[in-house]
């Protein structure tokens, strides 16, 4: 390959001289076996699994939901989420706030005990008292990062009903978003 320096620091590949790095793009998701498609959005092409029930997509969605910038639930790593989803403790976001129903099962899981469970429950309790921008960001809405969520909430004065009724055109008209 030939490489050049882009933006002062970041190396950028200019050319693949041997063409040895050609990959066959899969048309099937390696996790669930569902159809995989390339979707172009804002001049960027990305490969997506089209199965809405894909386990990998669910785990990534839950991982974003509990992340530091979102609901900030410490103790729910991607691996722990996989375990809890596999055990049936979590099926939707709201289930995270009712993990106390599974206390006896959770404390017997490998890597968990009373202390880990209590720390997790404290973190879940703190997440109940978060801000609306964090909740909106945590939902994983395309093109709505934390800063856009903050701008939307500011525009609509944290009125969830007004935000829910807003059209795509109205949201795009907000300064800094469109």
Where are the regions that the model predicts?
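Accessory alpha-helical DNA-binding modules that contact the DNA backbone or grooves
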Residues: 8-178
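Duplex nucleic acid-engaging cores and interfaces of nucleic-acid transaction enzymes
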Residues: 1-2, 29
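Short, surface-exposed secondary-structure boundary micro-motifs
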Residues: 3-7
């Amino acid at each position: 390959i030939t490489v050049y320096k882009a933006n002062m620091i970041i190396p950028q590949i200019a050319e693949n001289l041997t063409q040895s790095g050609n990959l066959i793009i899969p048309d099937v998701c390696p996790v669930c076996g569902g159809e995989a498609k390339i979707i172009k959005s804002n001049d960027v092409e990305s490969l997506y699994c089209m199965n809405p029930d894909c386990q990998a997509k669910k785990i990534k969605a839950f991982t974003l939901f509990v992340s530091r910038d979102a609901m900030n639930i410490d103790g729910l790593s991607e691996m722990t989420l996989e375990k809890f989803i596999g055990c049936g403790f979590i099926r939707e976001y709201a289930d995270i706030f009712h993990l106390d129903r599974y206390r006896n099962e959770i404390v017997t899981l490998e890597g968990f005990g009373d202390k880990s469970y209590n720390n997790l429950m404290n973190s879940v309790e703190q997440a109940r008292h978060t801000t609306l921008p964090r909740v909106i960001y945590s939902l994983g809405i395309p093109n709505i990062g934390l800063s856009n969520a903050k701008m939307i909430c500011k525009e609509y004065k944290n009125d969830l009903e007004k935000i829910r009724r807003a059209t795509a055109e109205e949201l795009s008209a907000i300064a800094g978003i469109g």
